[in-house]
Amino acid sequence: MDALEITQKLISYPTITPKECGIFEYIKSLFPTFKTLECGENGVKNLFLYRIFNPPKEHTEEKHAKESVKPLHFCFAGHIDVVPPGNHWQSDPFKPIIKEGFLYGRGAQDMKGGVGAFLSASLNFNPKTPFMLSVLLTSDEEGPGIFGTRLMLEKLKEKDLLPHMAIVAEPTCEKILGDSIKIGRRGSINGKLILKGTQGHVAYPQKCQNPIDALASVLPLISGVHLDDGDEYFDPSKLVITNLHAGLGANNVTPASVEIIFNARHSLKTTKESLKEYLEKVLKNAPHTLELESSSSPFITASHSKLASVLKENILKTCHTTPLLNTKGGTSDARFFSAHGIEVVEFGVINDRIHAIDERVSLKELELLEKVFLGVLENLSEK
């Protein structure tokens, strides 16, 4: 089965996060020679398929768990859940159609196209040396992500089945297939700042302490500020205000407080602690409360790593383009792999229609992506 056929089947399952809708039974049926592990909580389901090719005669699974020298273990990872499709589609979002060289359907780009490509590549892979191949899929990536990939990796750690390397098939490309590989991601810190004052009548300002006056002085030091200068792969860390509220809606009452909600997408150079230190310094003369919560940590895989190098080689060979290595965009499940010390990168189709009405993927992209993934497997098994 090729990537197109598998992707069409995957799209036909209405797996709006965190629903799995039986899609894992279909995927398992494609891999009768692979062993399976499944886990999940709170309506989330996760699937791990794995096979050790060409194990030494004395090899057993028990020995695999104990021996210090193991076959290289490579994992393809992704999610089968999708965001709600919304209205105004030209066709049923869960009945895939092909039109003018594109496959239409919810998840075509994010990320059932990528999953279809790596499932097809895995089916066509036949190494001649000892090699361990696995597939990790979750129904909880578009949602909170608490019981998805993170949970499955913890289970794999308990069983000593963590991979050495992984590719997460997120739609990373911008204009043409092969133009972008994510070798890391920025971290994300959420914050709430409350500037405190004294509510009162606008006609008696001497009896009020208007927190908006304090806001006016500190706002230029908070809104849009660069927290560091970034580096070759990370943009400068930046604080962005997402919501600001003050007052009762009356024109003759000064507010008792101003609430500011913000987010900081940050590189390895900025931490929650350094952000707190900066903000407390800026706010030292303003009565306030400050809450910070890190929702994800930044990470990076070395640009010269074996995995990144092999992937670049196959993109150049198949797509005839040299990819840009970067960390742009939001968070992804790749961060959970990195937290376990796993060499991880992200690569997939173009992302111009993700989460959009009439989401689609080019048929040519699916064909080329499958070839890239198969080439990566073949090269890794040879080295």
Swiss-Prot record:
UniProt entry keywords in alphabetical sequence:
Amino-acid biosynthesis, Cobalt, Diaminopimelate biosynthesis, Hydrolase, Lysine biosynthesis, Metal-binding, Zinc
* Protein's UniProt keywords contain Iron-sulfur: no
Q: Name one Pfam family in it.
A: Peptidase_M20
Quick one: a GO biological-process term for this protein? lysine biosynthetic process via diaminopimelate
Instruction: List ligand-binding residues for Zn(2+) 1.
Output: 79, 110, 170
**Residue sites binding Zn(2+) 2 per the record:** 110, 142, 355
Instruction: Give the matching InterPro entries.
Output: ArgE/DapE_CS, Bact_exopeptidase_dim_dom, DapE_proteobac, Peptidase_M20, Peptidase_M20_dimer, Peptidase_M20A
- The catalytic residues are 81, 141
Enzyme Commission number(s) from the entry: 3.5.1.18
Briefly, what is this protein's role? Answer: Catalyzes the hydrolysis of N-succinyl-L,L-diaminopimelic acid (SDAP), forming succinate and LL-2,6-diaminopimelate (DAP), an intermediate involved in the bacterial biosynthesis of lysine and meso-diaminopimelic acid, an essential component of bacterial cell walls.
Record protein name field:
Succinyl-diaminopimelate desuccinylase
What is this protein's gene name?
A: dapE
